[in-house]
């Protein structure tokens, strides 16, 4: 019984402090940029996150609008201007903006570029 209580406390702690999202973001940024000195790069990112949190200034994420558009266009190989919900969810996971256990609701509509950009930008601000 004690183990499950500890596991529950650990899970609550990780969720409360958004640790999974931060680790996922750090991993995505590391793989996106592939810096020569990964440990120094991660320390720098964490410091910038801390400064952004303390000052209330938006953190400059690695995904600007041109990157978001490029990612969308790769998924929209047919050029229809939409992607499927599955592609959308996988893109959010790849970017570290969605956890495995997050329950995203599929409303049955295709995802447009504007919707994709809006959601990616919104979620990046929440990190």
Swiss-Prot record:
Transmembrane segments: none annotated. It holds the Pfam family EF_EFCAB10_C. Residues 63-98 form the EF-hand domain. GO terms for molecular function: calcium ion binding. Disulfide bonds: none annotated. InterPro entries: DD_EFCAB10 (IPR049760), EF-hand-dom_pair (IPR011992), EF_EFCAB10_C (IPR056587), EF_hand_dom (IPR002048), EFC10 (IPR039879). PANTHER family: EF-HAND CALCIUM-BINDING DOMAIN-CONTAINING PROTEIN 10. This is EF-hand calcium-binding domain-containing protein 10.
């Amino acid at each position: 019984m004690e183990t499950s209580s500890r596991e529950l406390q650990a899970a609550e702690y990780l969720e409360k402090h958004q640790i999974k999202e931060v680790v996922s973001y750090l991993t995505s940024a590391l793989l996106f940029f592939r810096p020569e000195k990964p440990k120094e790069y991660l320390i720098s990112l964490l410091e910038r996150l801390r400064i952004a949190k303390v000052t209330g200034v938006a953190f400059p994420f690695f995904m600007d609008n041109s990157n978001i558009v490029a990612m969308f266009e790769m998924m929209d190989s047919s050029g229809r201007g939409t992607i499927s919900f599955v592609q959308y969810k996988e893109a959010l996971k790849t970017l570290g903006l969605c956890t495995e256990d997050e329950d995203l609701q599929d409303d049955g509509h295709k995802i447009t570029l504007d919707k994709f950009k809006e959601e990616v930008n919104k979620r990046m601000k929440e990190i």
